[in-house]
């Protein structure tokens, strides 16, 4: 009831107000009066009925609505502004409060609803510019209410009409308030239209969700839930939630919906199904609509009033729509306009045409009429924005320009507020492609700044929200507009500025930047947008060709800054994109004990914060169901990029030389080899130069013809007009200039055309088509070439083609139509190609600003044509768009553009002093370094770091006095990079640390601390400038060269100090220090690089001969302290570098430097040793190695002394913690042991003595690994001949070490180390005894006699004392060491030294060896007897009589001492040994040697045979070296000139003779025991003298020698030796001639040589053995052989004796005859018979010689025995028989 009364009140008052108007009373308004009166009467009647309660509240019906609306319609049609205003106001309120819904059918127009008629009536109230301003405002209010009201629905044409009317009011109204209100209303309407469309989909999604949530899911519902439509709707809902507005937009991230728009969206979001109406209304709906209207109108009026008189008031709306392009305000729009009727009519007609023509088609594609509404409005706005501007300079107040601007602004608003449906629905995407993008291609090159600016803003929005669907359109916009404007030299500053402002936003979005690279640069068919963009920005940032652009220097600088800002943003995006790969060293630690402080964390976040604040990554836009997406595979894209580069290079080659390009592409596998493949390539690849394509196809070569045929055959001319076919044929290339080439092409074209159109009847043959095609080409040239003045007429053309159709004419109408078509449009290449070529060809230098503008306008026009053609070409195309997600894209991106980026930053830093430019360049370099670091791109990283270092001026050759603020900032940046990217810097640390080093020097010089660096050495006299040259050369690298070399005055110094003053600030000093303190947080590889380059810089600092600096050396010490707590693996790698550096520094020729190094080493070592060391680790060994190196290489006594003292201090204070370090300690002392400085030797020996005697007592297990080094060290002390007392004491300590090994074998056995291949049982030997004994042998071999004798004694004492603990195989090793003593004899040395060695050491050693062997025979005989025999043989064979005698003596002693333990095998070996010695020492040369050239003297045949009674052993023997074993040929001519050779030979022969004699004696002593034979001979003599043999009886039965232990075979071997020796000596003694020759040659001396002693002793020994065996019952089995041997030997001996002429010779044989006869007499009768019968004749002969009485007595006994045995004589009385004749058995 209340509602009805309210409505009645509105209507009544309005009608009464209309009737009351005096205008209504005029006659022409009679119908209006009647309608008003009728309506009032009905209202009164209705109210009366309601008051009386006679009827229920009436429901709205169609007839009633008609009655109510008719007076208002008539009122609106009246010409009275007041009446119209009143009517409109009432309608607006009725609609706003829901009193009119308009759902009733329109009685006057079937198929329409009343609301459509109402809206049409409201719109008709606007009659153009002359419409009353109040009426205009009421129209705007009414229409906004109609669109926004929740009570009514208007769609399609009606809603389009409301928008059009407001649009026209904005254009036509002269009132600023109305204009602003109309514009705001338009924005609000669009907001409502598109919001309702989005909310409708949300509503559907909610309705789909309700049954799913409330009921158990059936299979059908489940299928629906996962259907694409449902998923899309649900996704759309999620995307449009107001709770997630954080998404960053390319349009500066603001949300363009106005507050009023939000209100209307929230309160008007109850969409209904098609055609439905609301059954009820919200209580507050009317108030809400009222508020909206009041807000819109009030705010519009207020803003217009505030800005009255200012330019472009609609920019307020622009601000609401988030446009932020910093271009100065544009033009005034307050002027009056004309021609609105035309404009409105064109709008209406266009839109009506669209609505009528496409109504059903469009509606069929939309799921709701709201979507169609939005589509129609959007399309209309696009078409409005495409309307061309008038000719000439654009008028800011013209309808065309204002229409274009507002349409673009509204489009921008729509796009910025686009919801999920608009962003994903295929119809809207297609609308954007077909209408908006084409519109942008025209407006995007507009010369009007506002239009251009809006176009850019729209493009930004498209790029932000729609790039998934607009891949190819975005490419066109970039390639043909953005980049062309940047590249064109004639572009205006305003256009460049706006483009680069837009690029600033694009480049600040990481997702967008990476997407551009992935989708264009990595697409085979797309342009390299990213690469080209960066290159263009780089050129702008470098400020090239600035003066040619018509810009002021300030404008150029602004542009440079923006270019740099874009480049920096791109790198920031890359950093942001790859941030997950970055490890900040300041947020971790490599030391377990350390943690970051809050201050350090804060300090380290600089770059991170800057990076994070740059821009957040864009979210991926939602793709529609029809959009193709590609999987993001970085490796695949990289492969594509490589292929693309190959193709581009091939195209580049083709455009120079086609065949070469084709060949290259085929070689790379990018192009097939068949002609069809090549033809297809020519068709598809638009980047090919069209002229080159034409020339290639027209060439006469066979291959070219085949390609051309394939090219034409791939064209389809079916059912095409001839001219159209020809156009298609010629659009892909430019016709070549040669007529023959054209002829070939036309011939093939004609053939192909006829082939495709075989059913045609126009052409008689292909010849006709060929001639006609040729004539068309000629016609095109004639009509369209500016060179042709007189153009061909149609008649002339027809005449020219007479008779070409098989001698007949083609129809004139046909030829005429061809002429007209060609006249209207020439035949040319494809428009995109033609325009692109035209654009590129117009680039030229301009002479004036006017010329530049004209040329630029021409270029912009061509650009627009190209862009429009390309946009239209791709409007229906679909291209897959990849939304990049992988981090790995950044690496190839950066690799592609790092060089132009570096060029831009370098030139910016070098040429521009602007602080903002420098700041941008430095920030860019920082980001570039970060990227290069993260992806391990060493070349790129090093290049950027070197650039920073270069611009710091710290390493440049220019004077450091030129340092400016940018250079200071560069230094700070370099320090920051070191701090934040240290983990990745690698070799780049070199540049950074070099700069830090030079920075420290600059600080010192700048603060006056070290001005001596500028004036040479401080030792020079004052005022001298001689040092300048040196200092200048020294610090050229610092940039001090120019400052120094020219001398230093006060002004220069002041300037210098001022320039480097800031580098000495606390912040810089702290930052530098933080690099070193922060080294603990570098990872394991980075710290090694850091240390390596710090050491390299330190070496450079120390390289100065005059002023070495120790800054870096000090830092090395510091970081060693800081990093000492790292894990051992890392620390060992660090110390490997630092230790090597200390090696070099410790040997620095400058003593101060070396002292500092050694002292630093000491401090570090003490700290390191405090940590201790676990078993089997070797870190101490590595750490202390520099001391060892310094001792080895540095000969400075000061440094060596200091090193020894440092080690001594460590030993005294840290002995308990030292493990593997003992090796280095002993190595250092080993070096000191050989020093000539007594103090060094004494100090080292004292510490060594302390270690061995004291520390080993307590820490022996820890030092086992170095025990060998300790012994070696002592050995070195012992070998220092300059300090004999130390030598003896050292040997004593070695003996002392043996005590440790003996007492602690278990410790040695249990010790495990690197030599794990040593068996536990052998460790005592390998680590204990062997080193001791080996070093003693070294002492023996190296030292002088007293020391080596002591060493020899100690060595054998140790053997004898501890040998019982040795294993058998240890003895083998030991004797190899012992035998090394004799190895010294094998070296060529001085004769005197060798002789001394043989007679002392070797002699001593031989006897000692035999003693040890005897002592430990059981252990040694199996393993070492052969070696000992071999060694004895070697000694015997030496040319040293003493050694030879000692060898035989030792052999004798060895056998006598141990023979009773010998096995038969050992006796075999022993006998073989003696046999070998015998054979090798027989001096056969004595019998054969002859002096060369000496003739035999016959007088010498009868020589005096008197011999001296002295034995051969008394012959004068000269000391000799080991001589030759063989004599040279007697015929050698060199004998006369080489007497020394003879002496050497004779000495050797003498020694052999001595050895033979010694060996005979040795055999005798071994078999019968020493002195037994002599005693026996003496007894025989006595017996002979006494004429009795009784004394011999007891000797026969006592065998003290080895006889009883030797087998007969062993004895036979010895007998062979003896017999051979006897035979040789007998032969020599009998050869008087040879003896004379030798005597004359100097052999023997004064008397003739003889071997009488050898002759007799060998035979005597032989006889004794044989006779002993002959009577030995145990050898009965060998008696026969013995007897045979005995008979032979004795017979030969007696026979020889008879032949001897010399009395002295016979005298020497006396004892032999006594022995022979005496022994024979002692055998039994049976055996005696055999002997007597053999000897008898010889004995009879002997009787004739003058014999001594003893021999005659024995002969007498022998003959008496013969008589008895042979019974010649029988004694009468036994008592009378001589004792000799009594039987012995």
From Swiss-Prot:
Signal peptide: none annotated. Inhibited by brefeldin A. Residues 508-528 are annotated as: HUS. Residues 1514-1532 have a biased composition (Polar residues). Changing residue 534 to W: Abolishes interaction with PRKAR2B and impairs TNFRSF1A release. InterPro entries: ARM-like, ARM-type_fold, DCB_dom, Mon2/Sec7/BIG1-like_HDS, Mon2/Sec7/BIG1-like_HUS, Sec7/BIG1-like_C, Sec7_C_sf, Sec7_dom. This is Brefeldin A-inhibited guanine nucleotide-exchange protein 2. The gene is ARFGEF2.
